[in-house]
Every structure is written in structure tokens, then in C-alpha cells.
């Protein structure tokens, strides 16, 4: 039991009452974070291997980011992108400095899905084409434009024809023949994640991603890599495409880009940017000075602290430890850097719940069978040891089938009790 179940919090009640209802809320209220640790309102600590779906790769409340935000908040928070701003210029310079060569034009926005929207529009104006190739099991976000690239039917079907799924061909991630057949002279862009995150933590093969580069060039289409989850050191390089020696024409960026502030970008080659008419796209909050200040501090800290090397080394350490777990429930441990998935032979949800509830470790699902770990790169090896030990205990102790049967037995006996007492009351009246 968490403290909240014993003593329901007013914050938990308020959030559950007023939220739109689209989220499956946990029974816990988080109030503070530092590095790889977060604390709930009752003071219980958790090792965070979710970090806001992969946002806080630098750790929660990194001191440089906190200082930059504090200073900028007292100076200037709002300036639209039509009016140049010192922090925005500094951020753009820093960002282009770490991006693969040639990606030196940037559209700034606020979330991953907006970066995908931008990518879609820039690809259409750059090529004069409007067909796309995306990947089965791919996830690109949930706005209607981005949703057209997202494969999972449950995210698309509730919105029927409002999601444009006629102009997108989905190919099996890794299938070279399907890829070659799908990319034609009508294709504006091929969209893919270098490691599928939501789709089960699946790294692309070098052959597949390199063939995507080759065939898009041959057909005059763009290659757009979705590095929203993989970017900014998560996979052990600043960007995952560096593992494959591939430079795309455009790259969508978000999550860890700016120290936890809601920031995103579509970075592209000049030839792609130059074809968008002035005023053809825009956003109010994109490139706001507050996020830009956080972004500058975050990018500098990533470089100074060797965050990519940390993610590479700790990722290998954690993956080795997970692979050493002897459990018949594990089908496969896979990933790249600190983007790690453990595919089980059964549903992952009860194990993820037990990790949080019983062990104080936050992790998340990626498809119903996969437990996904996205710890910050500043996590210590001791914390990794704790996470792996907790996971092993949970695999040993949780038995969803037995628990479900016990639940059913309890329900049946409760119903039996009710029938007996109803029967008794009838008799006694
Ligand atoms: C690969 C990928 N693309 C796009 C998105 C959408 O980003 P956002 O949730 O910021 O809109 C996500 C979010 O998880 C993602 O992992």
C-alpha cells in the first residue's frame, strides 16, 4: 500500500476529478526530483527510470538548468520568433553545433508531435509531393498530422477519416523489400525512429537505415529521422543516427532537448527549409527565451559531463545485469545505450505496477509485453544495481495468474456473502 491509499491526498483527488480523463492516473502525487530520484508527497523516494518519458536524461532539476531558468525568468520570458532574441540565437548556435553536418536550419516548437507536424509540412513544400512512408510499430505523436505516421490502430481508429491514412504507406521495420517497394517518385519522405521506442524498444539494423538513406536519395524523397526519444545522448551518442553513419535530410527533436522545458524542433538541410514560403508555418510559444535559456544550459552540461559516454557505458552495464537475470518470464533484453526494453512472455503491466508500488522504481510499458527503462544518464551504478535487483524480485514474486485467481475467489466469496445475507434478511423480515 502507498501512503496515498491509506490517506487519500487532496491533490490526487483534485487531479483525478478535473483531468480530461485520457490518462490512466497512478495513485501517487510526485512533488520533487533530483538527479535520478523523485519523491512523492509523503516523502517516499523512487528511482526514476521514466524521467518524463525520456525527457530528463540530464537528471531532474539539473543545477545549471535551474540557475539558467531562474536568471532568465527575471529577465525576459516572452518574445515571438519574428523578433530576434539573444538566448534563442545562442540556443540555435549550440544546437546546430551538435547536430550532424548539414542540418543547420531549425524550426522551433513545443512538443514532439508539433515537430512531426512541422516535418510533414516542410517535406511537402520541399518536394512538392505529399505521400509518405512510415513504419509499422512506429510512434510519431498524436496530433492529427503526426498521427497519420503513427502505426498503432488504437491511437488512430477513434478519429476515423480525420486521420489521413491514405497518403501514408506503412512498411515492416527492418524489411528491406517492403521499404524498396514503398518508396516511389511520389514519396515526399520516409519517416522512421532509429530505435522504435513505444513500438517495443527495437533498434534499427544499420542495413535498414542505410538502405532508407540510399533509396530516398534515388527517388528524390527526404529521409526524416524521428530522434524525439533517441536524441540528446539517450542511446550513447548525441543522436542515434551517429551509430549508423547516416545523416538524414531532417530530424525531429524534443524531450531531452532543453532541460525539461516543453521544447522541440525540426532540424533540416537548407534545401528543405528554403522551399517553405515565409509565414507557411509558425507557433506562439516556440523558441521562447525561458526554454531557450534552459536549452543552452542543458546542451552545455551534456557536453561538459560527457553524457553520451555515460549513457553508453551505463547502458551496457545495465543491459548486462538484466541479461544475467535467470527468469523463465524473460523473452529478450534489448536496446541501445540507456533505452532498454525487457520483453516478457506475458503482460508487463503487473510487473511495472509492482516495481512502483512495492519497490519504489518507476519504469513503463512499450507494447503490452515490454518493460521499458529510460533512466537518466546521471543514474549511479548503485542505483542501476538497485533497479535490477528490484526487477528480479518482482519477476520472482509477482504471479499475475495466481493474483487474478485470488481476486476472483475473493469476489465470488463476497458475492456469496451478499447472497447469504440478502437471503437471511428476506427470511428475517
Ligand atoms: C519517437 C516519438 N515521436 C514522437 C513523440 C511525440 O512527442 P510528444 O509526446 O512530445 O508530442 C514521442 C513521444 O513519446 C516519441 O517517442
Curated annotation (Swiss-Prot):
GO annotations of cellular component type: cytoplasm
Cofactor(s) in the UniProt record: pyridoxal 5'-phosphate
InterPro entries xrefs: Aminotrans_3, Aminotrans_3_PPA_site, Class-III_PLP-dep_AT, LysJ, PyrdxlP-dep_Trfase, PyrdxlP-dep_Trfase_major, PyrdxlP-dep_Trfase_small
Cofactor note: Binds 1 pyridoxal phosphate per subunit.
Enzyme Commission designation: 2.6.1.118
GO BP term (any one): lysine biosynthetic process via aminoadipic acid
Function per UniProt: Catalyzes the transfer of the amino group of L-glutamate to [LysW]-aminoadipate 6-semialdehyde, generating [LysW]-gamma-L-lysine.
Identification of the protein by name: [LysW]-aminoadipate semialdehyde transaminase
Amino acid at each position: 500500500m502507498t501512503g496515498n491509499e491509506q490517506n487519500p491526498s487532496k491533490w490526487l483527488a483534485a487531479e483525478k476529478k478535473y483531468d480530461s480523463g485520457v490518462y490512466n492516473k497512478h495513485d501517487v502525487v510526485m512533488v520533487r526530483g533530483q538527479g535520478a530520484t523523485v519523491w512523492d508527497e509523503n516523502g517516499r523516494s523512487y528511482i526514476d527510470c521514466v524521467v518524463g518519458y525520456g525527457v530528463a536524461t540530464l537528471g531532474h532539476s539539473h543545477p545549471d538548468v535551474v540557475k539558467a531558468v531562474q536568471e532568465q525568468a527575471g529577465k525576459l520570458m516572452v518574445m515571438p520568433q519574428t523578433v530576434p532574441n539573444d538566448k534563442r540565437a545562442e540556443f540555435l548556435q549550440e544546437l546546430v553545433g551538435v547536430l550532424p553536418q548539414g542540418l543547420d536550419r531549425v524550426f522551433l516548437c513545443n512538443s514532439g508531435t508539433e515537430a512531426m507536424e512541422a516535418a510533414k509540412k516542410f517535406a511537402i513544400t520541399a518536394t512538392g509531393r505529399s505521400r509518405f512512408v512510415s513504419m509499422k510499430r512506429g510512434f510519431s505523436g498524436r496530433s492529427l498530422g503526426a498521427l497519420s505516421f503513427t502505426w498503432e490502430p488504437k491511437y488512430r481508429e477513434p478519429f476515423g477519416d480525420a486521420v489521413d491514412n491514405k497518403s501514408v504507406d506503412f512498411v515492416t521495420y527492418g524489411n528491406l523489400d517492403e521499404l524498396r517497394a514503398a518508396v516511389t517518385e511520389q514519396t515526399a519522405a520516409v519517416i522512421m525512429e532509429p530505435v522504435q521506442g513505444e513500438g517495443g524498444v527495437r533498434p534499427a539494423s544499420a542495413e535498414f537505415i542505410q538502405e532508407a538513406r540510399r533509396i530516398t536519395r534515388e527517388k528524390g524523397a527526404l529521409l526524416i529521422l524521428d530522434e524525439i526519444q533517441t536524441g540528446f545522448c539517450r542511446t550513447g551518442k548525441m543522436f542515434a543516427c551517429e551509430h549508423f553513419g547516416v545523416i538524414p535530410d531532417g530530424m525531429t527533436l524534443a524531450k531531452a532537448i532543453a532541460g525539461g522545458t516543453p521544447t522541440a524542433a525540426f532540424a533540416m538541410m537548407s534545401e528543405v527549409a528554403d522551399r517553405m514560403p515565409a509565414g507557411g508555418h509558425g507557433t506562439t510559444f516556440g523558441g521562447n527565451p525561458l526554454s531557450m535559456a534552459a536549452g543552452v544550459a542543458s546542451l552545455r552540461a551534456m557536453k561538459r559531463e560527457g553524457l553520451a559516454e555515460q549513457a553508453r557505458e551505463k547502458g551496457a552495464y545495465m543491459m548486462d545485469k538484466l541479461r544475467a537475470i535467470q527468469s523463465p518470464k524473460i523473452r529478450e533484453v534489448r536496446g541501445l545505450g540507456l533505452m532498454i526494453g525487457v520483453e516478457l512472455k506475458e503482460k508487463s503491466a503487473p510487473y511495472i505496477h509492482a516495481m512502483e508500488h512495492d519497490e519504489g522504481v518507476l519504469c513503463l510499458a512499450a507494447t503490452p509485453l515490454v518493460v521499458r527503462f529510460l533512466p537518466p544518464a546521471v543514474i549511479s551504478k548503485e542505483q542501476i544495481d538497485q533497479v535490477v535487483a528490484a526487477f528480479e524480485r518482482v519477476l520472482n514474486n509477482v504471479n499475475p495468474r495466481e493474483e487474478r485467481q485470488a481476486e476472483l475467489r475473493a469476489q465470488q466469496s463476497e458475492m456469496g456473502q451478499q447472497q447469504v445475507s440478502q437471503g437471511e434478511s428476506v427470511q428475517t423480515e
